[in-house]
Structures are given as C-alpha cells and as structure tokens.
Swiss-Prot record:
The lineage of its organism: Eukaryota, Fungi, Dikarya, Ascomycota, Pezizomycotina. One of its GO terms (biological process) is protein transport to vacuole involved in ubiquitin-dependent protein catabolic process via the multivesicular body sorting pathway. A zinc finger (FYVE-type) spans 165-225. Residues 261-280, 307-326 form the UIM domain. Belongs to the VPS27 family. It comes from Aspergillus fumigatus (strain ATCC MYA-4609 / CBS 101355 / FGSC A1100 / Af293). This is Vacuolar protein sorting-associated protein 27. It is a peripheral membrane protein. Keywords: Endosome, Membrane, Metal-binding, Repeat, Zinc, Zinc-finger. GO terms for cellular component: endosome membrane; ESCRT-0 complex.
Amino acid sequence: MAGWFSSTSPLDEQVERATSSSLEDMALNLEISDLIRSKSVQPKEAMRSLKRRLENRNPNVQIATLKLTDTCVKNGGSHFLAEIASREFMDNLVSLLTTEGAPLNTDVKEKMLELIQDWAMAAQGRMDLNYLGETYRKLQNEGFRFPPKNEISGSMLESSAPPEWIDSDVCMRCRTPFSFMNRKHHCRNCGNVFDAQCSSKTLPLPHLGILQPVRVDDGCYVKLTSKSSLPSNLSDRSAFKNHSITKANAMEPRGARAEGGFDDDLRRALQLSLEEAQSKGSSGYVPSTRINDEPAKTTTQTNHEEEEDADLKAAIEASLRDMEEHKKKHAAALKSNAAATDSSTRDSAAATPLPKNPYELSPVEVENIHLFAALVDRLQHQPPGTILREPQIQELYESIGALRPKLARSYGETMSKHDTLLDLHAKLSTVVRYYDRMLEERLSSAYSQHSLGYATAPGGSPYPNIYPTMPSHIPEGKTGAENFYYGNPVADRAPPVGNTYGYPHSSRDIREPTAAPSGPISSGVYNQPGQAVPQNPPWNGNAPSVASPQPSAPSTPFPNNSSGYPGPSASTQYYASAPHPEQDSNAYSGPRPGETDVSHQSSPNMRRDSYYQSAGAPVTARASAPEQSPPTDQGQSPAYMQYGDSHSAQSTGQPTHQHQPTAPPPQSYYFQHQPPQSAPLPTHSQTPGAPYGTYPGGDVSPIGAPAPAVHYQPAAQTKPAVEESLIEL
C-alpha cells in the first residue's frame, strides 16, 4: 500500500545508498553531485530528496546526509546552491536545531552548525545566497555556539555547470533558419542552439560533470579537443618528466573528472617552467647537447623513474655550469670593450651582445609569462580544486610577479617615448603648415605678376566673347565708346541699329540722333557676286561678307594707315577683327582741311542715299535740318557714314553690339543692281516731337540674330532708289 502513495526515483535510491549507516562512499557522493551539476535531475528535486533523508532518526544517516549535501554544494553548481539557500531547506535545518521534542544528537548538531557557518562564510557578497548569511546571524543571535571559524574562499562554492539553453530561430553558427526538416539541437557545453550539420560531434564533458558523450557544436569540439601547443624548445625536453611530483601530491584528481593527457602536459609544463625559473639569471641559453645525450642511458624499465631523476639533475647541473661560463665570458667582454678599441675586440664583443636596456624582458621571462597564461587558460576547464593541488603554479606565479617592477619601468619608458614622439609630431605638423602657407603665398604672388604682364596683348582672340565690356583705359584721349568700336576697326561691319541715344555731344551741336535700320542687315543687300571672303571672320560668324577694295582705289577719303592706331586694350581685342584698309576710323580725329564743318544730320542722309535710293523716292529727313544737302563726291559717302556713326557712338557713351557702323566700300556702289532678297528695311528715325533718348536701350543682341522689337513707329515704306553710282554709269 505504501508504494501506491509514494514512489522512489533513481536519485532517491542513490541518496539512500550514499547515506547508509555504513562507511561513507565518496565515489557515490561525487556521482550524485555530477548528476545534479549536469542537470540530469532537477535541483529542487535533489534538494527535497536530501531534506527527506535528514528527517531520519539515525544520527549516522543524518551525518552522512549532511556530508553528501556539503559535497553537492561544492560541486553541484550555482543552480543547486540557489535551492540550498532557499527558505525551504534552511528553515528545515533551523527547525531541526530548535526542536523541543526528541533532542538532536550532539554530533549531528555540531556538524549542522559547522556547515551553516562554512556556507555563510563562502556566500559572502553574493546576493542570490544572502539567506545563508541571514540564517547564520539569526542562529548566532539565538545563542547557538558555532565552532571556530575557518577562512574559506568563495571559490569553494564555484563549480562549472552546464549553461542555460538559449532559444533561437536560426542556427547560431551558420544562420540557417530552422524548419520541419532542419531541427534544433543544443550544445551541452555552451548552451547555444545549432542545426544538425553544426552540432554533429559528441564529447564527454567532465568539467561539467557529464561523463557520457553528449552533443557539442563544432566550435566547442575544436576548443575542447585542441590542446595548446607548448613552445618548440619544450618539445625536446618532453622525456624529462618528474614523476616525483605525482608522488608528492596526496590529493590526485580522479580520472573521471580530468583527462589523463591534460595532467601529463600540465606537470611537464610546470617542471619545465621551474627549470627555467632557476636559470632566469642567464639570457635564455640552455645547452641541448647534454640533454640529447642523456636519454640514451636509460636502459632498464625497472629503475626508469630513478634514472629520469638523475638525468634531470645532471641536465640542471650542466645548465648551471654553462650559465657560470656565460657570465664569465660576459664580464670579460665588458672589460675588453672598456680597455681595447681595436677591431678584434669589437668582434669579440659583438659575439656576445649586451642587453640593450636593463628593463627589457629576457626571452625566458617572456616564455614564462606565455606559459603561465596558457596554464591559467587551461585550468578554467578543470575542477576548482585543481589549482590548489598544484603548488608549482603558485611558484610560477611568484616568479612572474617579480617581473612587475621591470614591466612597470618598461611601460614608463615607453610612455615617455610616446610623449616625445607626440611632441615631435606636433612640431613637424606646425612646420609643414607654415611651409604650405609660404608656398601658397609665393604661388599667388607669381600668378598676380604673370596676370599683370599680359594685360594688353595685341591681336584678335580665337575665342570671342558675346558680351563685351568697357575697357578701363582709353588710348589717345578718345571716349570709351569710340575706343571700343574704333580701337581696332572690324573688317566687315553691319549697319548700326537705330536705337541711338539722343544725348547731345559735348563739343558739337547734335540736332538729330542718327537713325539706322533696326536689326542686322539682310544678306541680300551685300550679296554681291565675285566678292572675296575676308581673312579674319567677324566676331559673331554670321555677318555678311563684304569685299574689301584695293588700297589704290581713288574713292578712299582717308589715308590707309592701318598701323597708325594704338593697340587695343585687353577687353576690346575680343570684339574687333583685323584692321580693314578702308575703315581706319581712329585716323580721323576732326574735319578734314577744306571740308565744311557740317552738323551730324548729314550722315543719316548719306546713309539713306547709299542704301535706300533704289526705291526711287528720297528719304524724308528731320524738319530741323533742311539745309543739309547730299555731297557731290560719291566716293566720300562711306567716310561720312563712318564719321556720323562714330559721333553717334560718342554721344551715347555706352557700347552696343549693333552700333558698329560698317560702311560698304566704294566698290559696293557698283554691284547694288540685284534686287533685295527680303522686304525693304524701314527707316528708323524719330519724329520731330519725340525727345532725345526715348529709346529703351541699346540692342546688345549679336549681329546676325533676329532684330529685337522696337518701341518706335517706322516711316512709310519707300520705293527702292537707284544708286547714284548707277546713275553716274
């Protein structure tokens, strides 16, 4: 009937066998602790099993249960410690101590108080185990007498346990998502989740209390199976294993909890580090000939350990003798360097180099530091008590601790060098910045001098600018507009557009502004057969070509002095072509001797006579100038046109594109018999009542572009007049 209401688990059976009234079974206790640490059983279930076992009335069973509980506390992991430090277990112990019924056995009571004190001392500073300290102080206040305190480190309760499993939707190694075909698998060593491809290895984990092979991922498998390689100079001395170290150790870790190969490597590394620590005064030189010759003497297997000890002693003695010889040679080298300066002495000194700095680490010291780091790294996977059972690690730690002053001096020297280099770098950057500034100033000054040297360059520019600018200086005292348009006469000029400003001139009485046809002249007016293309094209490339007369033409009113004018300025050279022999306007500075000083209203009349007499009707002139009559000399018509246009440009004072008066040469009068290709251009003249300057502004559109809209009404169209030259023929 009792079996119906109570069931015994496998853990309860093992606990009963481990806590029987017979002698203590330490192996079974460790096996139970491994089960708890590997999480094969739940920690709460294990705690309740031990609590039930403590209720037994047999004092031997209670003492055995307390010992088993202490073993599980020290080796069961933090998850089991949390259950022991819970109120459920600790209050049960307090109730056993304070029971008023049957008195508790004295040995059981002392053992219980001792364990509570030890657990409270080891759990100091851990918030998850603070109830142990509270129970200990509560019992002290109630008057319980505890045994003398033992200094117990908190590492006594530290033991490696399998980590908590982590969940994820993808493999934490190859990032492959899990699906119905790709299942999740947890690594027992790290707790991460992987797929089947990344966790196909199995390995026992004795450091976690897992003795049977379990699933691990590829990374943990490589980390656990690969052993840190020893230095190359240690492999030659692998035969000199001191087995006396194993005999001297009273507490040997059990084979189920540590790998045999790890123990051998650890002892070998410790022995070699001790040998090197004894000979740390030397520069790292260890003779290898004696070591390589000694193993041949070990012949029999019976006295193998004794012979290895003798060989080890002989090797140490040989290394000490070599060290003394090396010291003597080093001292002799120092004396020889101080006394002699010849080449032979220098060669012998070079054979035994002196240490560069006293604070530099020797190769042996560097090797000891790396060895100690490797050993500490490997001890992390071992039970907590392993480091306490290996006194050689402590000796190696002390020998390395003696290097701290040397390392501090080296660090200080390095920091001073670093500060010096930073200072030098700052100075160098400042000097480079100053040098760059000097170079920039020198380049800027050279560029400004170069630009001033080429301010006025004669000749036409191959890249004309569409928008002209007024030059800064005017040669020969001419006004800005006259210098702009006549500083370098253009070979082919179009008739000016009639948007002349009506400002009066300062030295002449201008009664009527110059009127001219608006927009560029149609190509039909100058489309004479047999004309030659000028050598330099116009600045806009669209002006009609006009044949140039020969220099010996009798109709030239002014002398041909193309080189008599000064060179154009830098701005005018973009808008003026090569000088024309017939259009040197700068050579004209006033009325010619023998000519009548007429007002400027005659120039538009002559232009009308030259261009529009083919209509058969005279062009109407302004009523304010009835006294002007056309000249009798037909050859002087272009000159008067130029003269009129030049003073019109002077009256405006501003350059415009359409104000470049292009007077046709005298030869053009004999080829105007062709009919115009377009409608006759209207005459742009102001009405008598209009004031001067009523035009909106100069037309700056390029020659050849469509004529802009004008704000004045053109005169009535006249019939094409016949050229006077044709009448003369």
